Curated annotation (Swiss-Prot):
Gene: ribBA
GO MF annotations in UniProt: 3,4-dihydroxy-2-butanone-4-phosphate synthase activity; GTP binding; GTP cyclohydrolase II activity; magnesium ion binding; manganese ion binding; zinc ion binding
Annotated TM spans: none
Cofactor binding notes: Binds 2 divalent metal cations per subunit. Magnesium or manganese. Binds 1 zinc ion per subunit.
The protein's name in its UniProt record: Riboflavin biosynthesis protein RibBA
Organism whose genome encodes this protein: Bacillus cereus (strain AH820)
Annotated Mg(2+) 2 binding sites: E27, H141
Region: GTP cyclohydrolase II, residue numbers: 200-397
Residues bound to D-ribulose 5-phosphate: R26, E27, D31, R138, A139, G140, H141, T142, E162
Pathway: Cofactor biosynthesis; riboflavin biosynthesis; 2-hydroxy-3-oxobutyl phosphate from D-ribulose 5-phosphate: step 1/1; Cofactor biosynthesis; riboflavin biosynthesis; 5-amino-6-(D-ribitylamino)uracil from GTP: step 1/4
Keywords linked to the UniProt accession: GTP-binding, Hydrolase, Lyase, Magnesium, Manganese, Metal-binding, Multifunctional enzyme, Nucleotide-binding, Riboflavin biosynthesis, Zinc
Enzyme active site: D327 (proton acceptor), R329 (nucleophile)
Amino acid sequence: MFHRIEEALEDLKQGKVVIVCDDENRENEGDFMALAEYITPETINFMITHGRGLVCVPITEGYAERLQLEPMVSHNTDSHHTAFTVSIDHVSTTTGISAHERATTIQQLLNPASKGADFNRPGHIFPLIAKEGGVLRRAGHTEAAVDLAQLCGAEPAGVICEIINEDGTMARVPDLLQCAKQFDIKMITIEDLIAYRRHHETLVTREVEITLPTDFGTFQAIGYSNSLDTKEHIALVKGDISTGEPVLVRVHSECLTGDVFGSCRCDCGPQLHAALAQIEREGKGVLLYMRQEGRGIGLLNKLRAYKLQEEGFDTVEANEKLGFPADLRDYGIGAQILKDLGLQHLRLLTNNPRKIAGLQGYDLTVTERVPLQMPAKEENKTYLQTKVNKLGHLLNL
C-alpha cells in the first residue's frame, strides 16, 4: 500500500512531490511534500490545484532565528501544537499569492543572504518550526518534512500542502491512495519514517548502571541522557527481560509532589509504589521513570495549575489557562530507552489509552493493558473524574 522511505527520498532528491500520511489517531491527513531547496512555481501550482490546502514551509529553529520569524500567536492552543510563525512574502513580490511569487518567497527564505527585513509580514507563505529531534520527538508533518529534507542531504526545509477532496472533505487513506496512483506519486507514512530513523540513529545514551536495593526489592538502575534536552531518565529493571516475551512495563512521569511528598491531589505516588511492587512480584519487568513533571509542563507550572484548581478550574482547564495542552508529554525518548533495553512487546501498566498509542507510534507493541487503579481519596476525586471525562482514562470511579 505504502512506499518505502528510501523510494520517497530518491524522488525528493529529483525535485518530485511525495505524499506523507500521519496516524489515523492523530490528524489522519495526507500532505503533498517537496524539498524547499528544489521548489518551483510548477510544484506550487500542482499543490494548490490538487491539494487545495494551505501551503506551509517547515523549517528549523535556526531559520526562524536568522529571519526573525516570531510565533504567530503568543499562546498556542492548537490541539497538536503546530508551531506557526508569522506568515511572510518576499519584498520582491507584488501580492505574493501567485504560484510564481510563493515559490520566490520560499527560495529567498532559504537564501543565506536573506535577512528578516527582506520579508513582509503578514504574507502568503506560512513557515512552521519543527521540533529538534524531528519525528522522534513529534510525529507531525512539520517534523517529517524537515527530517526528509535532512535525509536527502538538502537544506533542512520542506514545502507541504494538505490534500483536500474535490467536495471539500479531508482526503483519508483511500482517497490519498487514489491520488498517488493518479499522479504516480510515492506515498509514505510518518510511522514508517519514525521506524526508518529509529533503525538508523538513536537519541539516547546509556550512561551508567548500578544495583539499587529498594523497599520493594532489588533492581538494576540504568541512567540515560538524551541529545534533545538536558533531562536525565532512569529505568529500573527486574529480572531477565531479554527472552522476547511481553514484559510488564510502567512508564511513569515524574511527580515530585506525589512521588516524594505523598500529595493527595493525585494518585502518582501510590501508582509508582504499586507498579514497583507488582514488577517485584512477577520477578521481571521495567519501571521507566521519565522526567516529565506535571504532564510535561514542569514543576512550577504544575504548582500554578494547582493554584488555578483551588480557584475552581479542573486539571485540563488549568493547563489550558496557562497556555499548555492538557498533556504535553512526549513518548519518543521513553520509547527509545525501552528499545535500548531490548524490549519490543509490552504489557503496559496504565489507565491511559493515549500512552498506549504514544508508545505504539514508536515501533513498540502493547500486547496487554494492565490496569493500575488506586483507591480514590476525597482530595483527588475531582482530578480523577476529569481524567476520565476529558483525558479518556480508563478508571472505575
